[in-house]
């Protein structure tokens, strides 16, 4: 909606999808709720649960061109990590956890936002490639919530194929 000639989020009808924030290339729209990223992550898990509930599903993740911001950001920077691989699972939560774990063990790409942050002596190191690239990322809370609501489990067995 509009107030005083500016676009604002109407919290009464907002579904929490974050699409408006991601679509704005100028960061002109921001949620006034400091927990917005955590709420968005929970909503993504809940929407995934609604789609998958009671249906047989199989999930594939191509872990490549890992950008510092959400893929929906039009102004994204160069990849922060090298291509990690292709992952597949019947369990979407286990799949995402396996992908995250692989990314956490990957070496940052040179001259990326992540490597620049890590080289900055004033940067607070999180020892997490995603948080060290963007401290607003809430991947852990999203996966914890997904597991809590029964979407899947964060436990997995990694079988490597060559």
Q: What are these regions, as identified by a protein language model?
A:
Residues 1-162:
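Extended, low-polarity segments enriched in aliphatic/aromatic residues
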